[in-house]
Amino acid sequence: MKLWKQCLWILAQAACTFAVAQPPVSAHEAEYGQAAAAYQKQDFATVIRLLQPLAEQGDATAQHNLAVLYQDGLGVPASAEKALYWYEKAATQGQAEAQFMAGLMYSDGNGMPQNYEKAAFWYRKAAEQGHADAQNNLAARYATGTGVAKDLAEALKWYRAAAAQGHPTAGHTLQQLERLPEAQKQPAR
């Protein structure tokens, strides 16, 4: 359900951006408006019909939203493989939420093999753009050495970044790590 709301939010943002821009900034303005309206009505077949061509043309927002539909099985059979395909398409274009979701899919391995190195790769890409959940997850990777070399100094860096944005888990974990002796917090060599 959270992904469904997230997709609606991204579609609404795209529609609003197109609606207030003068002159129209994209040939896709009408499609985004129609897709957002169909999404609100839970007419997912129409959403897919409108987003699929945009995604195939390389539109990162459409690619991300199509991934959400495949992940949640909205208007299409649920497919982790197709969801990951579209997340990675959007992620390679720099879309932080798609980068985070690709990392999450590789981390969780739901419907696909786990790959902690790829999870860390995508978490880092999103974390570098300020995505708090990705910063927290990347920090956890460094704290445990999962998919990356264990490095508490790097973990602290990313926990601090996430906590600065109000991420509750990061703040709690940061407090615990800050209590460690300084020697344990030094960068790995």
Question: What is the predicted function of each stretch?
Answer:
Residues 40-49, 77-89, 113-122, 149-158, ...:
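Structural signature of tandem alpha-helical TPR/SEL1-like repeats
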